């Protein structure tokens, strides 16, 4: 059990029998009445984001989480297979648990797999990944009236806006949190 005064972003808690990750929290002390903590929580099982208010000092159950580095091996149907880099065990993770991270996973690519209560709850790619451009329109010299960017399909199927000078075969760095082009590598 932890007090609402001990909340930290990324902490895992159990509320009403459901597992949540704390996305953000704010302690509020109104002029009248008791202090409270306003939070944004992500359900670990469904991915839904909710807002919840707790009384200051209220106790909630904390969940032990463990993050393990893993390498992506292959995909078979809707299962993604990863290898734990410490124990060399293979772990099969369903596509719905992998979620949006699938857009950034390449063969032998490293990810962080989050376990809660001994079960996989999420797959998190690194903050930046380098992916190859497999399809994009050729950039026409002097064509900057459209803002200087064009859509490009990357090797994982992700489509991002890239500058006109990027062509098929180039490798680009993408920010996995914003899903935006960063630079050509």
UniProtKB/Swiss-Prot annotation:
Matches recorded under CDD domains: S1_EF-P_repeat_1, S1_EF-P_repeat_2
Biological processes annotated in GO: peptide biosynthetic process
InterPro entries with a match to the protein in the record: Elong-fact-P_C, NA-bd_OB-fold, Rib_uL2_dom2, Transl_elong_fac_P/YeiP, Transl_elong_KOW-like, Transl_elong_P/YeiP_cen, Transl_elong_P/YeiP_CS, Transl_elongation_fac_P
Keywords: Cytoplasm, Elongation factor, Protein biosynthesis
UniProt-listed HAMAP family: EF_P
Family membership noted in the UniProt record: Belongs to the elongation factor P family.
Protein name: Elongation factor P
